[in-house]
């Protein structure tokens, strides 16, 4: 049975930002989020946050907070498991 994604559904996301953020930022990304430091081909550093669980309003709020701090957003994608079964 396929599950639809809606504005109010809790979904799992992966968020990638330019630069390196340490684990002290994890609270912004949800209690189950994990941070992964990566190096791109041009030797620039990025941080990938996986297992970010929130609804669309939470996601938009997070993106606004990052933008307000001047943090460059590289990508946001729906995680492998998509919508959570609750």
Predicted regions and their residues:
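Long, contiguous binding/interaction regions
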Residues: 1-86
